[in-house]
Amino acid sequence: GVETHVIEFAPMLMDEQLDQMGGEQLRRKIESMGVKVHTSKNTKEIVQQGTEARKTMHFADGSELQVDFIVFSTGIRPRDKLATQCGLAVAQRGGIMVNDSCQTSDPDIYAIGECASWNNRVYGLVAPGYKMAQVAVDHLLGSENSFTGADLSAKLKLLGVDVGGIGDAHGRTPGARSYVYLDESKEVYKRLIVSADNKTLLGAVLVGDTSDYGNLLQLVLNAIELPENPDSLILPAHAGSGKPSIGVDKLPDSAQICSCFDVSKGDLIAAINKGCHTVAALK
């Protein structure tokens, strides 16, 4: 079989979406599958020779790893060369600088998507690009609309492991409190980050079981008030009373149902009222 290694520059896996305990749990689950994980590794050079394999990776800490085959996963890099040549302002870490209206340093030129840098941040996801496009169009038409950032919540399956990160997954909001559920036998870790008054969900981390993701995401996006015991949202059914869920009737019309195309509950209701009564018709 093939011996597989994961080399990560950050101190933990998925450090944007997961907290430290979530990252450690993910690492344990991946390593239990036989995959070796190396974190805090800065690759200095790759040499086309080795005593045990075809290539040798040299890291900044002096260590090395011999491998036969390398797959790079480097994310996105904003293409801002044209903007630089035109004299437009470019962010220090790359990307064409834009304001809340998606205007560049030249107010007659707009930039959206992965080439744009808003508040020194480049979004590598499609949903923020759609949101930027809407803001730019509205501004061109004279309507008031502003880009104020985008939700980077994500749910995915990494090497067969269910992982989810929502909102302030690191609990950086001042006064934030946490509820943690850990089942070591089933390798499940869940954490809720709530406001100081215990009424608003600020973020969540899910590793090993993401069945609560949709419910928690709507609570965060729509600032819906939490039940009296927020931990009931992540505790298993056998731990007590039934798990509370958010019914569609409780969601505001502005609630986002599809992030890729920015479809809201109100959009779906309007389509249904116009005669779209099947899933195919709604699509």
Residue ranges with predicted function:
Residues V2-E45, G129, F147-V163:
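Rossmann-like dinucleotide-binding cores of NAD(P)H-dependent redox enzymes
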Residues T4, A10-M12, E16, E52-A53, ...:
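Residues forming the flavin
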Residues Q49-G50, N99, S195-T200:
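Short acidic-glycine loop/turn motifs at beta-strand connectors
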Residues G50, T56-H58, S63-D138, E225-G240:
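FAD-site-proximal beta/loop scaffold in flavoenzymes
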Residues C115-G214, A239-A270, C276:
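Mid-to-C-terminal Rossmann-like scaffold of FAD/NAD(P)H-dependent oxidoreductases
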Residues D209-E228:
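A short, polar/charged loop-to-alpha-helix boundary motif
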Residues N273-K283:
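LysM (lysin motif) carbohydrate-binding repeats in extracellular/periplasmic proteins that recognize
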